[in-house]
Curated annotation (Swiss-Prot):
GO terms for biological process: DNA replication; DNA synthesis involved in DNA repair; double-strand break repair; SOS response. It holds the Pfam family SMC_N. Belongs to the RecF family. CDD domains: ABC_RecF. This is DNA replication and repair protein RecF. The gene is recF. GO terms for molecular function: ATP binding; single-stranded DNA binding. It is found in: Cytoplasm. The RecF protein is involved in DNA metabolism; it is required for DNA replication and normal SOS inducibility. RecF binds preferentially to single-stranded, linear DNA. It also seems to bind ATP. Coiled coil: none annotated. GO terms for cellular component: cytoplasm. The lineage of its organism: Bacteria, Bacillati, Bacillota, Bacilli, Bacillales.
Length: 370
C-alpha cells in the first residue's frame, strides 16, 4: 500500500497544493513553522479522519474559508483507489471511489498509517489517556467495527453518567433504569476490552523481539493490558459477570460521585522491561527503545491483519533518536514501507534510506520537489 498523490484545498496553510509521491521514501525538508507537519497531518487525516495534534475540526480550515478538502489516491491490492475528505464548520464528509460514506467508521481503514512523532515518546511515560487513544486509533483502522463499538460505548457512558448525576442530586428517577444502562454498558465494555486485550497480545508478539534486538539482547519487553475486569480465560461472559459484580460493589460510590468509575475509559496499558515497570523505573533510553519497538511492531501487525504494509509518517522524530536507534529504524523500513519524513536537516543522518529519498522543500506554505 502507498499514497500515490494528494491534493489539498484550504487545509491549514495550504490553499491549493497538488503533490505526487515516491512509493519509497519522501522527505519534507524546511525550517520550523513552514508547514511540514501540516503535510503529514493531511496524510493522517486522509487515513483516519483524525489528527494527532487537535480534536477541533475548525483548526484545519484556512482562515476565512468555508471548508478544507483533502483528496488522495492510494495503490492497494493492485488497484488505484481515490479517497476524499472534506471538513466544514458542521463536520466531515468522506468518499471512497467517489461514493459518499454514511459513517466515518466505513471510511477509516482504506489507508493504513503509522505515525511516529516526538509526542509518541510519551506513549510509554505519559498519562493513561494517551495509551487509550493509541489503542483506539490503531485498532480502529484495522477493525472499523471497533470504531462503531467505541462510539456506542461513549454514548452509553454519557447516558449512564447523566443518570448517575441525577441520582447524586436526589432527583426523582426510576432506579431500574440504572440497572438497564449498566447491563448495556457491560456488553459494549467487554467487547472493547476483548479487542484491546487481543491487540496488546499480538503487539507484544511483534514488539518483544524488536526490542530484544535493539537492546542488543539485554532486555525483554512485556506488555500488559490493565483492564477493569479480571482477564481470566477467554470467555467474555465470565469477564462480563466480573465487571457487573464490581460495578454493583461500587454502585453507591458512583452515585455519590455522579460518574462511572470503571470501564475501558479508565483502563491502561503497562510496559515491563526485565520485569520492571518502564513507566516508573525505565530510563529515558529504555522508554525510547520501547516506543520505537511498538511503532515498528505496528507496521508488521497491520501487515498481518490487512495483507498490506501501512504508510509510515516520521514527524521530526529522527532528531529525537540517537544514531543507533535512527539506524535501526531506517534499516527496518528500508525497501518495505512507504515513508514520509519531516526534518529541518538531513545532515548527520548517515543512512542510505534518506540518501535515495525524494525530497520536497517546504517554505511558507509552498512545496517544491527537488
Amino acid at each position: 500500500m502507498h499514497l500515490e498523490s494528494i491534493v489539498l484545498r484550504n487545509f491549514r496553510n495550504y490553499e491549493n497544493l497538488e503533490l505526487e509521491f515516491s512509493p519509497s521514501v519522501n522527505v519534507f525538508l524546511g525550517e520550523n513553522a513552514q508547514g511540514k507537519t501540516n503535510l503529514l497531518e493531511a496524510v493522517l487525516m486522509l487515513a483516519l479522519a483524525k489528527s494527532h495534534r487537535t480534536t477541533n475540526d475548525k483548526d484545519f480550515i484556512m482562515w476565512e474559508k468555508e471548508e478544507a478538502k483533502m483528496e488522495g489516491r492510494i495503490a492497494k491490492h493492485g488497484q488505484s483507489v481515490p479517497l476524499e475528505l472534506a471538513i466544514t464548520q458542521k463536520g466531515k464528509r468522506a468518499k471512497v471511489n467517489h461514493l459518499e460514506q454514511k459513517k466515518l467508521s466505513q471510511y477509516v481503514g482504506n489507508l493504513n498509517v503509522v505515525i511516529f512523532a516526538p509526542e509518541d515518546l510519551s506513549l510509554v511515560k505519559g498519562a493513561p489517556g494517551i495509551r487509550r487513544r493509541f489503542l483506539n486509533m490503531e485498532i480502529g483502522q484495522m477493525q472499523p467495527i471497533y470504531l462503531h463499538n467505541l462510539s456506542e460505548y461513549q454514548r452509553i457512558l454519557q447516558q449512564r453518567n447523566q443518570y448517575l448525576k441525577m441520582l447524586q442530586m436526589k432527583r426523582k428517577v426510576d432506579p431500574i433504569l440504572l440497572d438497564i444502562l449498566t447491563e448495556q454498558f457491560a456488553d459494549v465494555a467487554i467487547n472493547l476490552t476483548k479487542r484491546r486485550a487481543d491487540f496488546i497480545q499480538k503487539l507484544e508478539a511483534y514488539a518483544a523481539p524488536i526490542h530484544h534486538q535493539i537492546s542488543r539482547g539485554l532486555e525483554t519487553l512485556k506488555i500488559e493490558y490493565k483492564a477493569s475486569v479480571t482477564l481470566n480465560g477467554d470467555d467474555p461472559e465470565v469477564w462480563k459477570a466480573d465487571l457487573l459484580q464490581k460495578m454493583e460493589s461500587i454502585k453507591q460510590r458512583e452515585i455519590d460521585r455522579g460518574v462511572t468509575l470503571i470501564g475501558p475509559h479508565r483502563d491502561d496499558s503497562l510496559f515491563y522491561i526485565n520485569g520492571q515497570n518502564v513507566q516508573d523505573f525505565g530510563s529515558q533510553g529504555q522508554q525510547r527503545t520501547t516506543a520505537l519497538s511498538i511503532k515498528l511492531a505496528e507496521i508488521d501487525l497491520i501487515h498481518e491483519e490487512t495483507g498490506e504494509y501501512p504508510v509510515l509518517l516520521l514527524d521530526d522524530v529522527l532528531s529525537e533518536l540517537d544514531d543507533y536507534r535512527q539506524s535501526h529504524l531506517l534499516g527496518a523500513i528500508e525497501g518495505k514501507v512507504q515513508t514520509f519524513v519531516t526534518t529541518t536537516s538531513t545532515s548527520g543522518i548517515d543512512h542510505g534510506t534518506l540518501k535515495q529519498a525524494t525530497t520536497f522543500y517546504v517554505e511558507k506554505g509552498t512545496v517544491k520537489k527537488s
